Curated annotation (Swiss-Prot):
<keyword id="KW-0963">Cytoplasm</keyword>
<comment type="similarity">
    <text>Belongs to the L-fucose isomerase family.</text>
</comment>
<protein>
    <recommendedName>
        <fullName>L-fucose isomerase</fullName>
        <ecNumber>5.3.1.25</ecNumber>
    </recommendedName>
</protein>
<dbReference type="InterPro" id="IPR012888">
    <property type="entry name" value="Fucose_iso_N1"/>
</dbReference>
<dbReference type="InterPro" id="IPR005763">
    <property type="entry name" value="Fucose_isomerase"/>
</dbReference>
<dbReference type="Pfam" id="PF07881">
    <property type="entry name" value="Fucose_iso_N1"/>
</dbReference>
<feature type="active site" description="Proton acceptor">
    <location>
        <position position="335"/>
    </location>
</feature>
<dbReference type="GO" id="GO:0042355">
    <property type="term" value="P:L-fucose catabolic process"/>
</dbReference>
<dbReference type="GO" id="GO:0030145">
    <property type="term" value="F:manganese ion binding"/>
</dbReference>
<dbReference type="InterPro" id="IPR038392">
    <property type="entry name" value="Fucose_isomerase_dom2_sf"/>
</dbReference>
<dbReference type="GO" id="GO:0008736">
    <property type="term" value="F:L-fucose isomerase activity"/>
</dbReference>
<feature type="binding site">
    <location>
        <position position="359"/>
    </location>
    <ligand>
        <name>Mn(2+)</name>
    </ligand>
</feature>
<feature type="active site" description="Proton acceptor">
    <location>
        <position position="359"/>
    </location>
</feature>
<keyword id="KW-0294">Fucose metabolism</keyword>
<comment type="pathway">
    <text>Carbohydrate degradation; L-fucose degradation; L-lactaldehyde and glycerone phosphate from L-fucose: step 1/3.</text>
</comment>
<dbReference type="InterPro" id="IPR038391">
    <property type="entry name" value="Fucose_iso_dom1_sf"/>
</dbReference>
<keyword id="KW-0119">Carbohydrate metabolism</keyword>
Length: 588
């Protein structure tokens, strides 16, 4: 059984015996326990289990104790460390020198013992050795007997832990390409060096004929298929057929295609993670899957010109339920856009919520909207907005039909209930695919995302000579008047899922205007997640040594390793590039 990645907590202490160390043992170990309790009571793994922490077997005052801690952590699948101390310790003697995992240090802000002095000293050692570490120091002085973790310290500890866990969850997993390059899209030209060196992942690939092989040879669970077909007939609404008359398929052919796309979903899932039922059916090799944390399906054009498209498969893999009930989503990229798949993966591992995959299709200016509809934009839409619309698939959680405190949300599967599942299905239909684009047919996904949801749009790009670069845009979904929505939506494909998005503007750089956001976006796709998580993404990017070329996150929320400040404190964007370039990828 594969262990969850864990956070290692290292209580460091002044090594002087005969009074000094003894007086600090309880306080120091209590700091470690309080950090472990904070993380385990607040954060969850993608499967819903509480995050696990491992505390060093003793406080660490000298090198042998640091070594003992290191050995324990190696056996315990520790993916990151947090060192805590209320006092002076011996910097390079007590530090964790693992170069391939993130490190953070919390130095207690008190007056009796110099925790801040140790923090500064050990961070200097980390900087000299080229092993980045995050420094955490509370704003306000605390009493020596105060066991509470201040709110500003909590925020940094949790931000660090979320990002560090993401690095651990990615390590030693795989990206699975189903097919190859779709329509010349750069993101589907999969770069194995990027996955290996930056994420610690491997790449696997299967030809799309694997789907037809498994269908023809019955390499799927026939009992599940019958159950799935019954559920789809009862719960999934076939939408209006927008095709011109000569392209409309017969009822008999549409029914056959429903069976086909259900099998596509089952096979796509089994390819990613395996299925023990296949071994019972005599297919032991296929039963193990590909250990894929994220995958993509080429589809266009070789598959979709002949077979039903992948929209149903992609939609339900990214959705948190199917005929087997509520479950965690799979991260799955349209058109095998591996870079958008990784963007979705970053978002998912930080939030445990499903992701919207979308084309960044159109910038609508206030003037253009008024010209086309006669409507004057107001509120969050006043400066214009972006039309996010994928060519036929999207997680049903993207409807915004789940709620929290009466507001639309996208939330982890363990918070979802059956009434929210039904609301998503009721507010979605599946029209026959546009056969001018998808000659083989299939069924697309059509819904409108509810407005007023805080969301973050993300994209990872590869820049020749630099490597991966991340861009982040926080903003809100919009709810337009119904007639305005229909007028604008019908100018594209009315059978596809739509999200209206207004990025938060800052008045400078790429966020001077909504047009500038669109104009600076690095690719045709974006990954959209619930919540404003830009600060967490920046922290994660720094751990992976991926520079961020545009974002609208407030400066006070940016949390990177301490040595980033030695690359410059005025132009943080340039300093980020220099730090990432000098340090190189995390797993190289």
């Amino acid at each position: 059984m594969i262990q969850h990645p864990r956070i290692g907590i290292r209580p460091t202490i002044d090594g002087r015996r005969q009074g000094v160390r003894e007086s600090l043992e309880v306080q120091t170990m209590n700091m470690a326990k309080s950090v472990a309790d904070l993380i385990s009571s607040t954060l969850k793994y993608p499967d819903g289990e509480p995050v696990e922490c491992v505390i060093s077997p003793s406080t660490i005052g000298r090198v042998p104790e640091a070594a003992a801690s290191h050995e324990l952590f190696k056996k315990s699948n520790v993916c990151a460390t947090i060192t805590v101390t209320p006092c002076w310790c011996y910097g390079s003697e007590t530090m964790d020198m693992s170069p391939d995992i993130p490190h953070a240090i919390w130095g207690f802000n008190g007056t009796e013992r110099p925790g801040a002095v140790y923090l500064a000293a050990v961070l200097a050692s980390h900087t000299q050795k080229g092993i980045p570490a995050f420094g955490i120091y509370g704003r306000d002085v605390q009493e020596a007997n105060d066991t509470a973790i201040p709110e500003d310290v909590k925020e940094k500890l949790l931000r660090y832990a979320r990002a560090a866990l993401a690095t651990g969850l990615m390590r030693d997993t795989a990206y699975l390409s189903m097919g190859s390059v779709s329509m010349g899209i750069g993101g589907s030209i999969v770069n194995p060096d990027f996955f290996q060196e930056y994420l610690g992942m491997r790449n696997e690939s299967v030809d799309m004929t694997e789907f037809t092989r498994r269908m023809d040879r019955g390499i799927y669970d026939p009992e599940e298929f019958e159950r799935a077909l019954k559920w789809v007939k009862e719960n999934v609404k076939e939408g209006f057929d927008h095709n011109r008359e000569d392209l409309v398929l017969s009822r008999e052919e549409k029914d056959r295609q429903w069976e086909f796309v259900i099998k596509m979903f089952m096979i796509g899932r089994d390819l990613m993670v395996g299925n023990p039922r296949l071994a019972e059916l005599g297919f032991e090799e296929e039963a193990v899957g590909h250990h894929a944390l994220v995958a993509g399906f080429q589809g266009q054009r070789q598959w979709t010109d002949h077979f039903p498209n992948g929209d149903f498969m992609e939609t339900f893999l990214n959705t948190q339920f199917d005929w087997n009930g509520i479950r965690k989503p799979f991260v799955f990229a349209t058109e095998n856009d591996s870079l958008n798949g990784v963007s979705m993966l970053f978002n998912y591992l930080l939030t445990n919520t499903p992701q919207i995959f979308a084309d960044v299709r159109t910038y609508w200016s206030p003037e253009a909207v008024e010209r086309v509809t006669g409507y004057t934009l107001e509120g969050r839409a006043a400066a214009g907005f972006l039309h996010l619309i994928n060519s036929g698939s999207c997680t049903l959680d993207g409807t915004g039909q789940a709620t929290r405190d009466g507001k639309p949300v996208m939330k982890p599967f363990w918070e979802l209930d059956e009434s929210e599942v039904q609301a998503m299905l009721e507010n979605t239909d599946f029209p026959p695919a546009n056969r001018e684009y998808f000659r083989g047919g299939g069924f697309s996904t059509r819904f409108l995302t509810k407005g007023d949801m805080p969301v973050t749009m993300v994209r990872l790009n590869l820049l020749k000579g630099v490597g991966p670069v991340l861009q982040i845009a926080e903003g809100y979904t919009l709810e337009l008047p119904e007639d305005v929505h229909h007028t604008l939506d019908n100018r594209t494909d009315p059978g596809w899922p739509t999200t209206w998005f207004a990025p938060r503007l800052t008045g400078k750089g790429a966020f001077k205007s909504v047009y500038d956001v669109m104009n600076n976006w690095g690719a045709n796709h974006g990954a959209i997640t619930y919540g404003h998580i830009g600060a967490d993404l920046i922290t994660l990017a720094s751990m992976l040594r991926i520079p961020v070329n545009m974002h609208n996150v407030p400066e006070e929320d940016i949390f990177r390793p301490k040595n980033w400040s030695l690359f410059g404190t005025e132009d943080l964007e340039s300093a980020d590039y220099r730090a990432c370039q000098l340090l190189g990828p995390l797993h190289k």
